[in-house]
């Protein structure tokens, strides 16, 4: 009986080893413990997995991280160097880096840390961050949050270094089935002390969030500090960053991500536990008004109107034929000169009918603002006294913003946004009910308007 039991034990042990070899999950990668194509690295909570996957309509193999299932891949290592078979291995190299090897033991991807210890290991944190650390000290040498793919996770920071310009940014997939680096990227940009989130198509600006006020991006219509939970700012080490958190009490239901898709749309997704898939909550592009500067300069875009583009009051289309064909990118030009310009050009005295401001409510303010830390009254007077100032806006957390060039990428919202004051000639501002100047002289319905006129006469 003893001999029979021993044989049974050996048989079961060999069988278990075989099963583990074809589909085992480990929690740490070391130089002696690698993962092959059929194996995975799993976070302690079981939510995140590192392993090999093949996208739909593809035969290539990639090493990636996914949430719950391979339908939600959030990070890819060898994006531009796919494997063409199942011979790949993820291991720690002799120099201490985490690497992906092909069947010929050639390195096709590496963490590429220049100064490493020979005693390193790689594992997950429960936030989904893959780290490479010194085994003895725990000192982190590299982590996947510093080199994201197309997905922003809770706790992951998008950042830009003010001195070097180095960015932590998202880059889209080439297509829904090809994780190689695509045409679109999303990153923070700081210009004249104003921080915004941009999406680029190559080097061309495709979408912008509006100025960051320390809690929200003011150009995202339905963003709120309470709902979105974004934080960030200057970290004291020369970096500007933003990140968000979700409550751990919500469990999987609280898992929320931002994913930049292959068409350049930044999507907010949350985990639908019932459907066992990610559901869409918000997207950066809902209409053509979300495309950067689609209406050109000195125009406003309203997705609820037809046509969507209109010249601001006091302006007319630069090219009327193009405007009639709904080609708006040439924008609008002022149809009546400003008083301050006439005074400056003719060296005459100012008359009683001075320039004023048209107030546009609940809008995404234009690109290229200049910032100054003054109160609303001073903000207005500064702009009025500067003939080059064409508009201003004041936001409690940002302060005074002013514009001296073309007004680009103004968008009308039905809620939130900021109030923008556009400089206009007195003769244009005195007709209080004419809010926008369509080329065909049509009007929006009153319920869709969020503008009013205020006249701010300069006190002499």
Give residue spans per PLM region.
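Beta-rich ligand-binding surfaces for carbohydrates and other polyanions
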Residues: 2-460
